[in-house]
C-alpha cells in the first residue's frame, strides 16, 4: 500500500510536465496572423481588384 501514493505522485508529476509542443520562442518567431485577419485582407484585395476594373479612380492597394 506504500506504493500507491508514490505512484499517484509520479502520475501527477508526469501530467504537469510540458508537452513537446510547448517550445520556447526565439527572436525570429513571428506570431501567425489570425484567420479573421487573413479573410479581411483577402476581401480587401478582391474588392480593390473589382473596383479597379469598374472605376480606375478608386484603385487602392493600401493593405494594412
From Swiss-Prot:
One of its GO terms (molecular function) is toxin activity. It is found in: Secreted. The modification 4-carboxyglutamate is found at residues 56, 60. Residues 1-19 form the signal peptide. Keywords: Cleavage on pair of basic residues, Disulfide bond, Gamma-carboxyglutamic acid, Secreted, Signal, Toxin. GO terms for cellular component: extracellular region. Contains 2 disulfide bonds that can be either 'C1-C3, C2-C4' or 'C1-C4, C2-C3', since these disulfide connectivities have been observed for conotoxins with cysteine framework V (for examples, see AC P0DQQ7 and AC P81755). Expressed by the venom duct. Belongs to the conotoxin T superfamily. This is Conotoxin mr5.3. The lineage of its organism: Eukaryota, Metazoa, Spiralia, Lophotrochozoa, Mollusca.
Amino acid at each position: 500500500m506504500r506504493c500507491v501514493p508514490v505512484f499517484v505522485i509520479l502520475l501527477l508529476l508526469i501530467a504537469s510536465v510540458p508537452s513537446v509542443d510547448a517550445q520556447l520562442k526565439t527572436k525570429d518567431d513571428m506570431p501567425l496572423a489570425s484567420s479573421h485577419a487573413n479573410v479581411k485582407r483577402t476581401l480587401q484585395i478582391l474588392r480593390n481588384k473589382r473596383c479597379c476594373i469598374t472605376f480606375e479612380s478608386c484603385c487602392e492597394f493600401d493593405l494594412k
